[in-house]
């Protein structure tokens, strides 16, 4: 059987220890070498004055005032004050437990007569009457309601000169401040599930532990302490005082400071960012009515543009984060239109654009400070994508739009096919725009965001104009270059290769012929035949096998075998020590791991689904230990892996160990196993689903967890290649005899091949589903 490859890897993986020891000895023999670098040596650090360094101890000191943090939405920890520091009037914070408390705080500027204003609270426009008769102090007002559709009431105003406010979750209550500074005091609101209250802030805030509540009260009444600023004193010649200060221009290089070896250069640049989205559309196997995935993926774009009369060559990489997964299911029939998953970016998503150009600013970008950028916004609108069905009108996805707004800039590294580039990463927050998107000829409509189906809408690129400024530490002599701190390493390059290889492997699932797959699954694949398709020399075959085993030794499957071996060893010890039947039953539970849960059902906190799922996770190892004549999931997994290795054009000796290990862990994640007891069958899956039924009628019977656990220990475990639902569907539509049913229950490969050769749609659809689960 094809799963022989996994057994060989598990059996022989210990032999790589010798290879590890040889490498370790070789490395230690070459480490004790002393080199005198002379008075000048290249280091990986900027020139600094070295002090004594840090002195570490075991004391952890919690800061009194932690921050400031930018506006965000999160669940604050219990027992910590959130000190809010707003700059403008309006809603500054809102929070709810989504049950019986909706609370928001509004800041009102001084000298406001009673008037009605419109505020957006929890995404809804609310009309609230506010006033502030104070001529100098700002007024904080809490507005609260106890039902989602109720009206807001005002509580606990705080008149504040420092313009600070604080909120804390503690003791089943939400604590705030009220009164008038400098004599403000704390108050509270009761709330159920107070620890799950999510807070959304619309201003900068600080975090103060409850143990320092007196400090928080001091800040509320008197204001924050002055932030300590570092001041550098630089001696200047008298003649330097006559230098006229000039305003920085759009594109210029300014020498900020200079020593004999290093100088600080300020680079100001106008930039034009062009980018595009890329996507991956994967169609499921079968009759052509189903799509498994429509997703975003990073996109590189290279272009040129003019800046101050100079042609600039630029390179961008666009990637997205925080995607929203949507799906559409038109029905359960093989001819029903289905999209298992399609990604949409919305207001909770981010777009990252890494930018590099060939100007002087990026030549020595290693040590950088004072990085800032101003960029315009851009709107991205989705286009149409047709789902080409074999028969009938084609559904198509259309519309969708988001606008990108600058949210910060950091340093990054772009990895191209040939070189790594130290770049600037511009982060953009998103806002949804009109139009909404829909899947025409279905009932999906009026959804907002930008789907991955056609995010560029026929455009070659989107464009953003702006400027950035940074100060970089570079050598004083322009002919020298600093070392690239984030250059391509072997591992980073390997990760890029693995990413491309995973995409190729997943796309190859549609090219596998099922009849050939069954034949291949029956072959005893060993390491030589499995890796024979790799383009490599015979001399490298041993090193390939060694590297695969070395990687496989650290896989979750190998770890499970090791844990199970320890469990069986402990079980054997307990059998030898105990003489009662119960001690023997408990010791054998290394296979099931739920005997203690089943012993007393009344005290068990786990459901049947949880228990069967727990047992099922061990059944793969049980099946490996007790081979049967039937085909199992690992046979199909290994056959698909072999087919994809032979078809792949990107597989190499360096990527093979990772691919084989990932395949053993990730191929066919949803598995079901069965045990047969006379005419009764017990079947349980790793997803928690379980069935018990009779062979002759496929009539379901009550599922006895204790009996199932006993049978798992004493009987052969069989992969449910054709699961119960497929068997019942086959019997209802075609009718199968008792002997045929037994053969399918035992996963007899001869019977499976007959059904596939007869083009039975139910069996073919089941095998196709298993093939499509072979994804990395």
From Swiss-Prot:
<dbReference type="GO" id="GO:0019062">
    <property type="term" value="P:virion attachment to host cell"/>
</dbReference>
<dbReference type="InterPro" id="IPR038017">
    <property type="entry name" value="Rota_VP4_MID_sf"/>
</dbReference>
<feature type="short sequence motif" description="YGL motif; interaction with ITGA4">
    <location>
        <begin position="448"/>
        <end position="450"/>
    </location>
</feature>
<feature type="disulfide bond">
    <location>
        <begin position="318"/>
        <end position="380"/>
    </location>
</feature>
<keyword id="KW-1152">Outer capsid protein</keyword>
<feature type="site" description="Cleavage">
    <location>
        <begin position="241"/>
        <end position="242"/>
    </location>
</feature>
<keyword id="KW-1162">Viral penetration into host cytoplasm</keyword>
<protein>
    <recommendedName>
        <fullName>Outer capsid protein VP4</fullName>
    </recommendedName>
</protein>
<dbReference type="GO" id="GO:0044163">
    <property type="term" value="C:host cytoskeleton"/>
</dbReference>
<keyword id="KW-1161">Viral attachment to host cell</keyword>
<keyword id="KW-1173">Viral penetration via permeabilization of host membrane</keyword>
<keyword id="KW-1032">Host cell membrane</keyword>
<dbReference type="InterPro" id="IPR000416">
    <property type="entry name" value="VP4_concanavalin-like"/>
</dbReference>
<feature type="disulfide bond">
    <location>
        <begin position="203"/>
        <end position="216"/>
    </location>
</feature>
<dbReference type="GO" id="GO:0020002">
    <property type="term" value="C:host cell plasma membrane"/>
</dbReference>
<dbReference type="InterPro" id="IPR042546">
    <property type="entry name" value="Rota_A_VP4"/>
</dbReference>
<keyword id="KW-0945">Host-virus interaction</keyword>
<feature type="region of interest" description="Hydrophobic; possible role in virus entry into host cell">
    <location>
        <begin position="389"/>
        <end position="409"/>
    </location>
</feature>
<dbReference type="Pfam" id="PF17478">
    <property type="entry name" value="VP4_helical"/>
</dbReference>
<dbReference type="InterPro" id="IPR013320">
    <property type="entry name" value="ConA-like_dom_sf"/>
</dbReference>
<comment type="similarity">
    <text>Belongs to the rotavirus VP4 family.</text>
</comment>
<feature type="site" description="Cleavage; associated with enhancement of infectivity">
    <location>
        <begin position="247"/>
        <end position="248"/>
    </location>
</feature>
<keyword id="KW-1043">Host membrane</keyword>
<keyword id="KW-0946">Virion</keyword>
<dbReference type="GO" id="GO:0039624">
    <property type="term" value="C:viral outer capsid"/>
</dbReference>
<dbReference type="Pfam" id="PF17477">
    <property type="entry name" value="Rota_VP4_MID"/>
</dbReference>
<feature type="region of interest" description="Spike body and stalk (antigen domain)">
    <location>
        <begin position="248"/>
        <end position="479"/>
    </location>
</feature>
<keyword id="KW-1037">Host cytoskeleton</keyword>
<dbReference type="InterPro" id="IPR035329">
    <property type="entry name" value="VP4_helical"/>
</dbReference>
<dbReference type="GO" id="GO:0044172">
    <property type="term" value="C:host cell endoplasmic reticulum-Golgi intermediate compartment"/>
</dbReference>
<keyword id="KW-0348">Hemagglutinin</keyword>
<feature type="site" description="Binding to sialic acid">
    <location>
        <position position="101"/>
    </location>
</feature>
<keyword id="KW-0175">Coiled coil</keyword>
<dbReference type="GO" id="GO:0044168">
    <property type="term" value="C:host cell rough endoplasmic reticulum"/>
</dbReference>
<dbReference type="InterPro" id="IPR035330">
    <property type="entry name" value="Rota_VP4_MID"/>
</dbReference>
<feature type="region of interest" description="Spike foot">
    <location>
        <begin position="510"/>
        <end position="776"/>
    </location>
</feature>
<keyword id="KW-1035">Host cytoplasm</keyword>
<feature type="site" description="Binding to sialic acid">
    <location>
        <position position="190"/>
    </location>
</feature>
<keyword id="KW-1015">Disulfide bond</keyword>
<feature type="site" description="Cleavage">
    <location>
        <begin position="231"/>
        <end position="232"/>
    </location>
</feature>
<keyword id="KW-1038">Host endoplasmic reticulum</keyword>
<feature type="short sequence motif" description="DGE motif; interaction with ITGA2/ITGB1 heterodimer">
    <location>
        <begin position="308"/>
        <end position="310"/>
    </location>
</feature>
């Amino acid at each position: 059987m094809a799963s022989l490859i996994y057994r060989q890897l598990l059996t022989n993986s210990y032999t790589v220890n010798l290879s590890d020891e040889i490498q370790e000895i070789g490395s230690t023999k070459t480490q004790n070498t002393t080199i005198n670098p002379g008075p000048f040596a290249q280091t990986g650090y900027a020139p600094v004055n070295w002090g004594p360094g840090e002195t570490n101890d075991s004391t952890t000191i919690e800061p009194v005032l932690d921050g400031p943090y930018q506006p965000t939405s999160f669940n604050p920890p219990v027992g910590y004050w959130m000190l809010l520091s707003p700059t403008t009037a309006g809603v500054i914070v809102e929070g709810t437990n989504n049950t019986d408390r909706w609370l928001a705080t509004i800041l009102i500027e001084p000298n406001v007569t009673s008037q009605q204003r419109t505020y957006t609270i929890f995404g809804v426009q609310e009309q609230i009457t506010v006033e502030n008769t104070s001529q100098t102090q700002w007024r904080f007002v809490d507005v609260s309601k106890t039902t989602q559709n109720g009206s807001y009431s005002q509580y606990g105003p705080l008149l504040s000169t420092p313009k600070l406010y604080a909120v804390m979750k503690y003791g089943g209550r939400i604590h705030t401040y009220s009164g008038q500074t400098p004599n403000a005091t704390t108050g509270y609101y009761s709330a159920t599930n107070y620890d799950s209250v999510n807070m959304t802030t619309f201003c900068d805030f600080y975090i103060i532990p409850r143990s320092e509540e007196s400090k928080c009260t001091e800040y509320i009444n008197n204001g924050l302490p002055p932030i300590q600023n570092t001041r550098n004193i630089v001696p200047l010649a008298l003649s330097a005082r006559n230098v006229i200060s000039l305003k920085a221009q759009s594109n210029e290089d300014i020498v900020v400071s200079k020593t004999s070896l290093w100088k600080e250069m300020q680079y100001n640049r106008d930039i034009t960012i062009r980018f595009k989205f890329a996507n991956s559309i994967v169609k499921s196997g079968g009759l052509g009515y189903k799509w498994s995935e429509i997703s975003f993926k990073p996109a590189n774009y290279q272009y040129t543009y003019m800046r101050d009369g100079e042609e600039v060559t630029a390179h961008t990489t666009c990637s997205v984060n925080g995607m929203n997964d949507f799906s559409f299911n038109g029905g359960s029939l093989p001819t029903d239109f289905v999209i298992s998953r399609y990604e949409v970016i919305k207001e909770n998503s981010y777009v990252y654009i890494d930018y590099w150009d060939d100007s002087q600013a990026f030549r020595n970008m290693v040590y950088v400070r004072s990085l800032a950028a101003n960029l315009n916004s851009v709107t991205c609108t989705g286009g149409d994508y047709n789902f080409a069905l074999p028969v009938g009108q084609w559904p198509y996805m259309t519309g969708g739009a988001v606008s990108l707004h600058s949210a910060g800039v950091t340093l990054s590294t772009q990895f191209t096919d040939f070189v790594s580039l130290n770049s600037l990463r511009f982060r953009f927050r998103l806002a949804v725009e009109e139009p909404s998107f829909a899947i025409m000829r279905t009932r999906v409509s009026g959804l907002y965001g930008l789907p991955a189906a056609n995010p560029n809408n026929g455009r070659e690129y989107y464009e953003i104009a702006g400027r950035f400024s940074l100060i970089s530490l570079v050598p004083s002599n322009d002919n020298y270059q600093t070392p690239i701190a984030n250059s391509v390493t072997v591992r980073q390059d390997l990760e890029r290769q693995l990413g491309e290889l995973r995409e190729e492997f997943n796309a190859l699932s549609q090219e596998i012929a099922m009849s050939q797959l069954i034949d291949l699954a029956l072959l005893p694949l060993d390491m030589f035949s499995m890796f024979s398709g790799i383009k490599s020399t015979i001399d490298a075959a041993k090193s390939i096998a060694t590297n695969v085993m070395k990687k496989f030794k650290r896989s979750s499957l190998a770890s499970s075998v090791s844990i199970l071996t320890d469990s069986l060893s402990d079980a054997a010890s307990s059998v030898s020590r105990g003489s009662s039947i119960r001690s023997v039953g408990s010791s054998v539970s290394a296979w099931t791991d739920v005997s203690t849960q089943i012993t007393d059902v009344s005290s068990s906190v786990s459901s049947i689904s949880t228990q069967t799922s727990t047992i099922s996770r061990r059944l793969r190892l049980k099946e490996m230990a007790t081979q049967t004549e039937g085909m199992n999931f690992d046979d199909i997994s290994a056959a698909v892996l072999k087919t994809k290795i032979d078809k792949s054009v990107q597989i190499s000796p360096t990527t093979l160990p990772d691919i084989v290990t990932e395949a053993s862990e990730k191929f066919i994640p949803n598995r079901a196993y069965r045990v047969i007891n006379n005419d009764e069958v017990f079947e349980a899956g790793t997803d928690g689903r379980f069935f018990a039924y009779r062979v002759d009628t496929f009539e379901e019977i009550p599922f006895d967890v204790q009996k199932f656990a006993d049978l798992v220990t004493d009987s052969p475990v069989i992969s449910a290649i054709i699961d119960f639902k497929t068997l019942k569907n086959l019997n209802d539509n075609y009718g199968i005899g008792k002997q045929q049913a037994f053969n399918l229950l035992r996963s007899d490969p001869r019977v499976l091949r007959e059904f596939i050769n007869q083009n039975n749609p139910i069996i073919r659809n089941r095998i196709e589903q298993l093939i499509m689960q072979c994804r990395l």
